[in-house]
């Protein structure tokens, strides 16, 4: 679709900006800020930069409350990614981004370019990307539309990540009806760097050059930021022109070239930023804004792959694999020579200027002349008032399960789409390229070694949309806690989080209430685990025809393993190891997998959550792991105790005998703050001497059977029966063989 330019007078009367996401009041405000009627280019820039995706105009009052700093944080929110000191002169860099809207309409390219964008965020800081993770949410797996989305989105993630040579090491995939028309595609990237080489996205120093490098600019993804800041109707779902097209081989060249610049030509570099949402306007104006500088760009110098592109199209294109650098005067040819070595298109397209204006020239004509701040700091901020949704004010009665055939229920639970084995999906990703991956997908957290040290990083992504649907604040805290449990069970101490805040339309009081309450839960939990929010993004307007997704903050968390010898996995290691349950169990079923299985619904008041107890349990487990007392550790989450027990047995084909003073149904309770641990018999005394909140409930056995005694029943389940249900569920739904 070619953009047709309009005069300032026509824009004022015909109001095309309404279709770009600006309101009449925002148009008037922008005109006042720039001192004249906006022309076609200027109104386009405002539509991108004032979108929720770029300006956070509804979410910023919430985001400002996040806890973002502790003694380890070297750089927090506001740059391409956050940076945390991990000692020995090294830092870990990580961030997550959503690509929900593009993936809904063009699943392969939407997912692939989401991966590409988050990788650029990491290497723009100067870090080498070492791992990718994802967090995916889909609708009912039995629907052909969902199966199509799953297939193409997974293919897009794998196609891009595998080609660029960065391992996809972990993630999660959830299924719930609320995501049927609005799938969630959240991608996370982790990098490692020398902590004294951090780069920032700034353009400072009058006369310094702006160098564009990477793919040529085309008409793909134009106004994608505004597209990502609106909700869907069925008619709009065909808007594929707002979706970008990715080239991972170009990205690999771009990554290697930029890392050579940041690593070996630091004296030449002032700042570097990727062209993501809102394309060239976002990267350039944000770099000027951070340095309090002015900027001039000549759009005729922008490498273009299509003819007769308008300034609006050039500036708002979201063509992928592009970066913008600010280079010191006199070093331009040195930098251009590096890019030439990688056969990359690169050009000097502008300069830093005195003052604070942002000026664009096209065919020798000044087509934009606005204050930098009009597109950055002066974007509107809205202070919304939330309203508690009726389902929270008047919750339904508690779900009280009845279990007459525990083995059948157990088998059915293992086949629930959110619980079931995802290896048929993640085996399409290369998890071992770079040869640093120590713990592969399928355990509680992925683990990748830090080359040249005896240490490793653990990483995970977690979200709990059902829990937040029943209580946004408590559910969000539970999401952070589960991420931390996953890391601790792997032997890691949590360092910090990145988030993707996936919510509905913030102009609706009920949706804004969910966002604001979720933030409170995230704040409380991140403080409890000393894991500040160092980066992230918001993805609002996840609605179709007025129906919103569950409020779903995705928590990406990274932790540090001080010694490779303490890396712990969830799989049973040997027969006769003792099995301990950490934490108390209650009848917590509202929002659980068991409720979904037996009723098909998610209702009631979310069960209680003791954040302080969770923190104590995690400290205890990490201490026991670091003292080499634990042979296997698994956090309890979806499906509860019995699901976790079965998962621990599958890898080594080992069964278990357990005896618990709980009703049978409570074996599927989802009480938080719990772990299953195994301890070798010779370490029993040392483990119990720690006096932790752990109860001996049984032992691992060589026989592939799970023998369970509860207060009201004794039953035995075949490992093979449970594993078959677990492994065949998704391939069966996807009409493929396991």
From Swiss-Prot:
The keyword Transit peptide does not apply. Its main location: cytoplasm. ATP binds at residues 56, 95, 499, 536. Mg(2+) 2 binds at residues 121, 274. Pathway: Purine metabolism; IMP biosynthesis via de novo pathway; 5-amino-1-(5-phospho-D-ribosyl)imidazole from N(2)-formyl-N(1)-(5-phospho-D-ribosyl)glycinamide: step 1/2. CDD domains: PurL_repeat1 (cd02203), PurL_repeat2 (cd02204). Keywords: ATP-binding, Cytoplasm, Ligase, Magnesium, Metal-binding, Nucleotide-binding, Purine biosynthesis. Substrate binds at residues 98-101, 120, 244, 318-320, 539. It catalyses: N(2)-formyl-N(1)-(5-phospho-beta-D-ribosyl)glycinamide + L-glutamine + ATP + H2O = 2-formamido-N(1)-(5-O-phospho-beta-D-ribosyl)acetamidine + L-glutamate + ADP + phosphate + H(+). One of its GO terms (biological process) is 'de novo' IMP biosynthetic process. It is an enzyme of class 6 (ligase). It is found in: Cytoplasm. InterPro entries: PRibForGlyAmidine_synth_PurL (IPR010074), PurL_linker (IPR041609), PurM-like_C_dom (IPR010918), PurM-like_C_sf (IPR036676), PurM-like_N (IPR016188), PurM-like_N_sf (IPR036921). Part of the phosphoribosylformylglycinamidine synthase complex involved in the purines biosynthetic pathway. Catalyzes the ATP-dependent conversion of formylglycinamide ribonucleotide (FGAR) and glutamine to yield formylglycinamidine ribonucleotide (FGAM) and glutamate. The FGAM synthase complex is composed of three subunits. PurQ produces an ammonia molecule by converting glutamine to glutamate. PurL transfers the ammonia molecule to FGAR to form FGAM in an ATP-dependent manner. This is Phosphoribosylformylglycinamidine synthase subunit PurL. It comes from Lacticaseibacillus paracasei (strain ATCC 334 / BCRC 17002 / CCUG 31169 / CIP 107868 / KCTC 3260 / NRRL B-441) (Lactobacillus paracasei).
């Amino acid at each position: 679709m070619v953009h047709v330019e309009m005069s300032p007078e026509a824009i004022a009367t015909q109001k095309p900006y309404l279709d770009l996401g600006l309101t009449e009041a925002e148009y008037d405000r922008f005109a006042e800020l720039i001192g004249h009627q906006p022309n076609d280019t200027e109104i386009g820039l405002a539509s991108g930069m004032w979108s929720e995706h770029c300006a956070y105009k509804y979410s910023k009052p919430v985001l400002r409350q996040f806890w973002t700093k502790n003694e380890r944080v070297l750089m927090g929110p506001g740059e391409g990614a956050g940076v945390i000191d991990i000692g020995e002169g090294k830092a870990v860099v990580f961030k997550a981004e959503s690509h929900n809207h593009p993936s809904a309409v063009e699943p392969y390219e939407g997912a692939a370019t989401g991966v590409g964008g988050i990788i650029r965020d990491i290497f723009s800081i100067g870090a080498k990307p070492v791992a990718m993770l994802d967090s995916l949410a889909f609708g009912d797996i039995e629907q052909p539309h969902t199966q199509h989305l799953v297939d193409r989105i997974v293919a897009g993630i794998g196609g891009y990540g595998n080609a660029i040579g960065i391992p996809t090491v972990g993630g999660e995939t959830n299924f719930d009806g609320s995501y049927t028309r609005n799938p969630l595609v959240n991608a996370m990237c982790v990098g490692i760097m020398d902590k004294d080489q951090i780069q920032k996205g700034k353009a400072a120093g009058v006369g310094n050059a702006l160098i564009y490098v990477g793919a040529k600019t085309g008409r793909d993804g134009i106004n994608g930021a505004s597209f990502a800041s609106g909700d869907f109707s069925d008619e709009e779902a065909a808007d594929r022109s707002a979706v970008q097209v990715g080239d991972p081989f170009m990205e690999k060249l771009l990554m290697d070239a930029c890392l050579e610049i940041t690593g070996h030509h630091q004296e030449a570099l002032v700042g570097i930023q990727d062209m993501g949402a809102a394309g060239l306007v976002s990267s350039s104006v944000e770099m000027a804004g951070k340095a309090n500088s002015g900027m001039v760009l000549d759009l005729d110098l922008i490498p273009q792959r299509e003819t007769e592109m308008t300034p609006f199209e050039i500036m708002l294109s979201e063509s992928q694999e592009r970066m913008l650098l600010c280079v010191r005067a006199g070093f331009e040819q040195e930098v251009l020579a590096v890019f030439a070595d990688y056969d990359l298109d690169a050009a000097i397209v502008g300069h830093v200027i005195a003052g604070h204006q942002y000026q664009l020239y096209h065919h020798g004509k000044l087509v934009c002349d606005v204050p930098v701040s009009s597109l950055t700091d002066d974007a509107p901020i809205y202070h919304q008032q939330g309203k508690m949704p009726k389902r929270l004010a008047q919750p339904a009665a508690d779900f009280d399960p009845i279990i007459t055939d525990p083995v059948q229920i157990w088998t059915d639970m293992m086949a629930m789409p959110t619980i079931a084995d995802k290896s048929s999906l993640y085996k399409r990703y290369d998890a071992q390229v770079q040869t640093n991956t120590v713990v592969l997908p399928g355990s509680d957290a992925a683990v990748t070694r830090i080359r040249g040290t005896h240490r490793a990083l653990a990483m995970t992504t977690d979200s709990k949309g059902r829990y937040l649907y029943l209580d946004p604040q408590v559910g969000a805290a539970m999401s952070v806690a589960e991420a931390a449990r996953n890391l601790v069970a792997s032997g890691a101490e949590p360092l910090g989080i990145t988030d993707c805040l996936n919510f509905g339309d913030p102009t609706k009081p009920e949706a804004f209430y969910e966002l604001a309450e979720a933030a409170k839960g995230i704040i409380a939990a991140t403080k409890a685990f000393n894991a500040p929010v160092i980066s992230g993004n918001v993805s609002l307007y996840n609605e179709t025809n007025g129906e919103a997704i569950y409020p779903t903050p995705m928590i990406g968390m990274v932790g540090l393993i001080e010694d490779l010898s303490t890396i712990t996995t969830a799989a049973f290691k040997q027969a006769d190891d003792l099995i301990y349950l950490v934490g108390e169990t209650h009848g917590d079923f509202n929002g659980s997998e068991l409720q979904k299985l037996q009723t098909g619904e998610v209702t009631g008041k979310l069960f209680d959550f003791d954040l302080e107890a969770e923190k104590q349990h995690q400290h205890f487990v990490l201490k026991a792991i670091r003292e080499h007392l634990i042979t296997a550790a698994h956090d309890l989450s979806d499906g509860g105790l019995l699901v976790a027990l079965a998962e621990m047995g599958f890898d080594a084909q080992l069964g278990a005998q357990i005896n618990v003073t709980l009703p049978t149904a409570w074996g599927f309770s989802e009480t938080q703050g719990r772990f299953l641990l195994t301890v070798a018999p010779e370490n029993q005394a040392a483990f119990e001497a720690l006096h932790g909140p752990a109860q001996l409930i049984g032992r691992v056995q060589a026989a592939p059977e799970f023998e369970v005694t509860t207060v009201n029943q004794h039953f035995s389940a075949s490992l093979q029966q449970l594993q078959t249900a677990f492994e065949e569920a998704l391939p069966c739904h996807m009409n493929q063989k396991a």
